[in-house]
Amino acid sequence: MSGISNNEIKYLRSLSQKKFRDESGVFVVEGEKMVAEALKSGFEVEKVWREEEIGTDVMARITSLSSPSPALAVVKKPGNVRLSDGKAVSEALGLRGLFLALDTIRDPGNLGTIIRIADWFGIDGIFAEPDTVELFNPKVVQATMGAIFRVRFHYCDLQLLADAAESAGGKLFGTFLDGQNI
């Protein structure tokens, strides 16, 4: 086994659990495209492993995917994901932009897909209720297909968001499952 120690293997496997991602302040991205997106983003990439350097068997042991990917990286989490007061929410909104607010998304694949679609539509940022699935869950990260590095994401109370947007003169639009067409 060249290029990776047993301790690194244990560490990488532990990052599949939220507890260890939170303690270490990092998350894992897998696949050539995702690693390339991480490297060209403003996120700090701590280390990259490539299948040709560590071997297919080792990559299969550390991957969270059903089949080993050719590359894997550990990326530092941004520090401003959880916002707890109106001032922080106002600063995250900035002067202008198009934002999406999400209320309690529970499925990791759905959140990742929403982030990917938001990126495609040019959404500047996403705000989600604090009980929404964790952004750095491996299934969320994979489903974003790199959009996690391009769309700002914050957890906050949506009432704080509505208040901050309103005081900044922003317009709010909402959708409801039982709403009426306009």
Where are these regions (language model features)?
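Structured helix-beta-strand junction loops
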Residues: 22, 41, 68, 168-169
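Glycine/small-residue-rich loop that forms an oxyanion/phosphate-binding "nest" at active or ligand-binding sites
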Residues: 53-78
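Short clusters of hydrophobic/aromatic residues that line enzyme substrate/ligand-binding pockets
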Residues: 182
